[in-house]
């Protein structure tokens, strides 16, 4: 199989796994989302739907190009958090992300700090974009959570609240590059914070996700201060060429890396975290067995038990390890296996050559 066809097939698989729609037959209808209507955007700024509605935006529409740029940037950071901005517009109850660019920030394993040079870069980039005819404004920021899921920490909530106060519409996107490599599908979340004095209704979490034990407290304290948006993806008729150019970098990194080897520290941390959660679940089980059942305990019983959550986490670790092992087996078959026909041709003696000379 040709390398180009292998890369194209891998890109198509990536698009299918992440529910990125195929190009439509009518390019004009497909590219309509890219048309920027300044009057419509100015009208939204005048009406300010976010002033009276605690969640005016319920959907995030992200272009395939912006998604891949954010994933490549997040993967390049490894275990260090990275940060960037997103450009786009708003359409009804949706924030449309059309492009993204990285910021030169100082990152650690748990946070990112934007310095003065990052703000200068941000202003200069936006100015040059306008000069080039790209009229889209900044509509949000993205950053990575390497290995600990897509949610907003206390610092993230404060940052997002500040941005929503002065720069609406604004969206927060979180990508987990470590879990993306392990699972194959992009681990991503899009969020907006509620107004400061707003108390949201008590609703169950729509989708379960694994949170490390040392992050659960931070997650639990702030999880009612923001809400998640439904994410969909789109691409234009001209995106294919740009995606091909960007995919070459992503594809080479995918081929040359192994989730089993590259994520060893992450997997070891997950197993240690699982052991701590098992110990905690055992302690809670002992208390519930010998203690009095209070009303708060009965309410907790209606929720998923800690042991059931541990079972989910262990199943997820197992599935990711099997996925990594399968990818290694497939790569071994593709690049290291020798065909039987080649073996036979190399081991068989060459009968077509000249006969050896024998003295009479």
UniProtKB/Swiss-Prot annotation:
GO terms for biological process: proteolysis; regulation of cell cycle; response to iron ion starvation. GO terms for molecular function: deNEDDylase activity; metal ion binding; metallopeptidase activity. A motif (JAMM motif) lies at residues 143-156. Zn(2+) binds at residues 143, 145, 156. Induction: Down-regulated during the early stage of iron deficiency (at protein level). Gene3D superfamilies: Cytidine Deaminase, domain 2. Residues 60-197 form the MPN domain. Residues 341-350 have a biased composition (Polar residues). Component of the CSN complex, probably composed of CSN1, CSN2, CSN3, CSN4, CSN5, CSN6, CSN7 and CSN8. Interacts with MCM2. This is COP9 signalosome complex subunit 5. The gene is CSN5.
